[in-house]
Swiss-Prot record:
Belongs to the BLOC1S1 family. This is Biogenesis of lysosome-related organelles complex 1 subunit BLS1. Component of the biogenesis of lysosome-related organelles complex-1 (BLOC-1). Keywords: Endosome, Transport. Its main location: other. Component of the biogenesis of lysosome-related organelles complex-1 (BLOC-1), a complex involved in endosomal cargo sorting. The keyword Plastid does not apply. It is found in: Endosome. GO terms for cellular component: endosome.
Length: 104
């Protein structure tokens, strides 16, 4: 029986035809290559597109919408400083007038 098994093993090893196991292995390897080369690439592109649509693009829109307001806030700060200076001048003038009227 040992020689029969050895003969079958030699035939299997030297065989030019595919076995069921080798056909399944080739199919698995082909599927693996397809998944890595095609499906994974498409999935990455889809993910990148969805990420841009859901995350990046809305942030860019918000930035563009409120960036002009941020620049106006800088103008607002300048206006506030000018108004503060004018109020201090008016307060100083009123104090001088009150002091003069109290003396006279």
């Amino acid at each position: 029986m040992m020689s029969n098994e050895r003969t079958l093993l030699n035939q299997l090893i030297k065989s030019k035809t595919d076995t069921v196991g080798s056909e399944i292995l080739k199919e698995i390897e082909g599927n693996d290559e397809y998944i890595k080369d095609v499906q994974l690439k498409k999935l990455k592109e889809l993910h990148d597109k969805k990420f841009k649509e859901k995350g990046v693009t809305p942030l860019i829109r918000l930035y563009e919408k409120y960036n002009a307001c941020a620049l106006n806030d800088g103008d607002l700060q300048n206006w506030a400083e000018l108004i503060d200076r004018d109020i201090r001048i008016l307060e100083g003038t009123i104090k001088i007038l009150e002091d003069e009227s109290n003396e006279g």
